[in-house]
């Protein structure tokens, strides 16, 4: 029995297949394979596979960046990143829904109601389509 296990391990090493080569699936669209982070079949250049984690619908965060649907969100200070709900998060004094900054949101009173709805002291916010955030 021990001989067979040892033979199997030797075979894996000689075949250049290691336990670290196993593809790790992260959510529906992201994966890690052979030290690279992927969105679908596209490599996310610069993404760190050791710190990559799914944080919401199509949102991935590593130690340097936040990605939405495989695209790096610009001007993010990762040390100030805070997840507020499934699709809402804040960075510095800005509130975001997925990859969209919510203009004039009141950061002190902002509350997430569910994955697509939120409110602050001035208004309520509703997600409609990928590119449209409505407030009322």
What are these regions (language model features)?
Residues 2-11:
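Sec-dependent signal peptide recognition
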Residues 1-2, 19:
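Intrinsic structural disorder
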């Amino acid at each position: 029995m021990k001989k067979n296990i040892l033979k199997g391990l030797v075979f894996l090493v000689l075949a250049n297949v290691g336990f670290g080569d196993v593809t790790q699936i992260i959510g529906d669209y992201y994966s890690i394979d052979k030290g690279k982070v992927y969105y679908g079949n596209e490599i996310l250049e610069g993404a760190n596979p050791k710190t990559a984690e799914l944080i919401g619908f199509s949102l991935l965060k590593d130690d340097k960046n936040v990605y939405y649907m495989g695209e790096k969100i610009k001007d993010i200070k990762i040390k100030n990143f805070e997840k507020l709900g499934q699709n809402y998060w804040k960075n510095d004094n800005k509130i975001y829904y997925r990859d969209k900054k919510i203009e004039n949101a009141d950061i002190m009173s902002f509350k997430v109601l569910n994955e697509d709805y939120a409110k602050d002291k001035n208004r309520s916010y509703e997600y409609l389509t990928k590119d449209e955030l409505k407030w009322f």
